[in-house]
């Protein structure tokens, strides 16, 4: 038998055996203790257990069917899918539209670049952050790309202020959502962005307290890319740096490790940062930085299979910016 096929069969069998639905009550009690969960009443606890049980069944099914990835009980396991998406993502239409970003059509076939590339290995990606219960993924993904742009240009990692974007971007709607290219446009409108230390994250909408004297990054120009080939993202990634992309996060909530091959694509609701790509056991994958904390996924990152539009990664035009 082919070694890769044998590996996947054994790996899949191991994953499928990891959880037993009949043990849901004991798993739930362990979950409550591990994540310090408290509910307002016994009826609420029962409701949360039923949601937990449903999520556990889905985790077991995913571990049996998606043999290149592993899924687990985590801090979101007592939330319905709709609750998780509404509280911990945040990609949405802005209040008004602007068109500052130049549209670039990438119609040439992909170049024959390296099989693997990862900006983290070059120390050009800041640490994983946690957006909490604020729908500001759009701000984190956009500023994550600017942080990497700054590191590439100045060989220095610096954390930028998502809170400034939340409070002072009057096109997007703060913790109630936004888009990637409009966030770039907002930074251009404001004249720049401050460091996180000067304008700390609060995970809430607040009054704008911007101080132009403390801007550390200024955006010269922004771009949106029309790509005919998903694989063209490799060229773009290597040339311009990490790229914010929009996805459907519905199928990544319980992710633990591995390469996601089966991922819903029913509507974009979350923004993440594309930082690299590679191949494992014959499966080409993208490496994406999430904003759910380093205790989620692969130390805050996840991988999806390339060239199948996993999680709708190709549905929205990717964007980037050029800094001064």
Swiss-Prot record:
Q: Which residues form the propeptide?
A: 17-113
- Keywords in alphabetical order, please: Disulfide bond, Glycoprotein, Hydrolase, Protease, Signal, Thiol protease, Zymogen
GO molecular-function term, one example from the UniProt record: cysteine-type peptidase activity
Keyword field contains Hydrolase: yes
Database matches in PROSITE patterns: THIOL_PROTEASE_ASN, THIOL_PROTEASE_CYS, THIOL_PROTEASE_HIS
Q: How is it modified after translation?
A: Synthesized as an inactive proenzyme and activated by proteolytic removal of the inhibitory propeptide.
Catalytic reaction annotation: Endopeptidase of broad specificity, hydrolyzing substrates of both cathepsin L and cathepsin B
Disulphides: 134-175, 168-208, 263-311
* Protein name, UniProt field: Viral cathepsin
Organism placement in taxonomy: Viruses, Viruses incertae sedis, Naldaviricetes, Lefavirales, Baculoviridae
Q: Which gene encodes it?
A: VCATH
